[in-house]
């Protein structure tokens, strides 16, 4: 097999001159010095050729060890996230759900890129764009392992390998749509590293695309975010095993996701439409505002080791919220739902009080129908006008390790809470 190389940065004149200077006193001729230099050069090239060939031949195709799962789904796009066992370049192929075989024709490809350059790594985030609202699409994920030669900036690839669409059906998902008559989603929170309970309450027998439009985790899915492995084992892997390859998953950060050595990387695994921990979702004429309440204690509390600045973060978020509630999407929605992990309380802990001070006055002007929270590890329903919360809309706190099924109809919002013991709470709220 021929090996072609492009060698740069070698100055043969310098090498010959140096050899001539060192050996001149020994009486060697210029021809002999040139011969020695060329022999060394050829030996070097041969060694590089053998090493490169061996390395390239030894690259194994990557394996997917986490994911894929759907993030940041909207009416025209969604993002697919997954992890491979080695550095790779990645892409997603997408086909309409039109009854043809996936191999019927070349499918549109979308690549993991940043500023125009393909990303080499183990985590892959591919945004699929230009889609139709309320439409089902099939997709597959593909990878090629990469070996980098840093001196020459060369890449050597393994054979490409993708999710199986020959023996198995491709992954299937559906975009959101404002034309949906009813919105159905499931919410969970405060599982605190209990993947077995998560899989029980959000099993694939329960969470299906026909029953649910999306799933939302409302914070504290882990207790302290110490490592990537913990996040995968406690949240990502059980979600993928049950529903997340085909039902969109959204995340609202809780105060416990802000803690731990790996906390700053949390949204590397859960990209959002805004690139921030706060964002919006629009589906079926319902406008969702997902907020981040930050930590529950003051920034200077000894528990945070001087690593947090959530007071300023919440102020920035409040400025964003002012723009959001005045947007046409919010004003023209038939219903408005706010998601935040920590509930507001003017007399509560610092985080609760700051949420009440900064967010509630803005939301009170936005005709909000319902706020959904977690954090307190028990069920609580606060009526509109509650003096402690200060809101002119009802607030529901979902218990820890429970699933809340929410259905937004034409004139009311119905929710049912189910815990691991199959105990249920049901209630309904009129839409303004």
Residue locations for each model-derived region?
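Active-site neighborhood of phospho(di)ester-bond hydrolases with catalytic His/Asp-centered motifs
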Residues: 186-189, 214-220, 248-255, 337-341, ...
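Extended active-site neighborhood of metal-dependent phosphoesterases/phosphodiesterases
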Residues: 141-172, 231-326, 358-364, 380-409, ...
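Hydrophobic h-region of N-terminal signal peptides that target proteins for export
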Residues: 46-55
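Active-site-proximal segments of metal-dependent phosphoesterases and phosphodiesterases across multiple
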Residues: 304-305, 310, 328-371
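Active-site environment of divalent metal-dependent phosphoester hydrolases
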Residues: 193-197, 223-226, 253-262, 296-300, ...
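Acidic, histidine-bearing metal-coordination/catalytic regions of metal-dependent phosphoesterases
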Residues: 34, 54-187, 208, 409-432
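Conserved, compact domain cores that house catalytic/ligand-binding motifs in diverse enzymes
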Residues: 181-258
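Acidic/histidine-rich helix-loop elements
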Residues: 103-118, 148-164, 186-202, 223-226, ...
């Amino acid at each position: 097999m021929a090996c072609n190389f492009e060698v740069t940065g070698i100055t043969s004149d310098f090498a010959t001159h140096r050899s001539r200077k060192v050996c001149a006193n020994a009486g060697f001729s210029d021809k002999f010095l040139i011969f020695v230099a060329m022999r060394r050069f050829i030996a070097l090239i041969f060694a590089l050729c053998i090493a490169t060939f061996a390395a390239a031949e030894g690259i194994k195709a990557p394996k997917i060890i986490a994911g894929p799962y759907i993030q940041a789904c909207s009416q025209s796009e969604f993002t697919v996230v997954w992890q491979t066992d080695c550095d790779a370049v990645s892409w997603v192929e997408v086909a309409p759900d039109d009854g043809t075989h996936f191999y019927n024709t070349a499918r549109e490809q979308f690549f993991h890129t940043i500023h125009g350059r393909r990303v080499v790594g183990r985590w892959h985030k591919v945004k699929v764009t230009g889609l139709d609202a309320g439409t089902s699409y099939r997709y597959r994920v593909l990878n090629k392992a990469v070996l980098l030669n840093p001196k020459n900036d060369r890449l050597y690839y393994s054979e490409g390998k993708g999710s199986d669409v020959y023996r198995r059906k491709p992954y299937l998902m559906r975009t959101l749509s404002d034309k949906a008559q009813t919105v159905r989603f499931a919410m969970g929170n405060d599982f605190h590293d209990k993947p077995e309970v998560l899989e029980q309450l959000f099993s694939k027998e329960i969470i299906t695309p026909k029953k649910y439009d999306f799933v939302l985790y409302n914070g504290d899915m882990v207790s302290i975010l110490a490592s990537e492995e913990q996040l995968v084992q406690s949240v990502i892997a059980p979600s993928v095993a049950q529903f997340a390859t085909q039902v969109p998953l959204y995340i609202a950060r809780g105060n416990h996701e802000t803690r731990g050595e790996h906390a700053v990387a949390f949204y590397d695994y859960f990209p959002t439409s805004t690139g921030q921990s706060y964002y919006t979702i629009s589906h079926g004429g319902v406008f969702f505002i997902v907020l981040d309440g930050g930590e529950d204690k003051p920034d200077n509390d000894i528990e945070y080791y001087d690593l947090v600045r959530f007071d300023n973060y919440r102020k920035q978020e409040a400025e964003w919220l002012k723009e959001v509630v005045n947007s046409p999407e919010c004003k023209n929605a038939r219903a408005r739902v706010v998601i935040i992990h920590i509930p507001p309380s003017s007399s509560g802990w610092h985080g609760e009080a700051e949420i009440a001070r900064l967010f509630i006055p803005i939301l009170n002007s936005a005709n909000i129908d319902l706020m959904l929270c977690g954090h307190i590890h028990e069920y609580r329903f606060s009526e509109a006008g509650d003096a402690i919360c200060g809101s002119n809309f009802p607030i529901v706190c979902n218990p820890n390790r429970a699933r809340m099924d929410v259905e937004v109809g034409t004139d009311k919002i119905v929710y049912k809470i189910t815990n691991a013991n199959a105990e249920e709470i049901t209630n309904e709220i009129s839409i303004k």
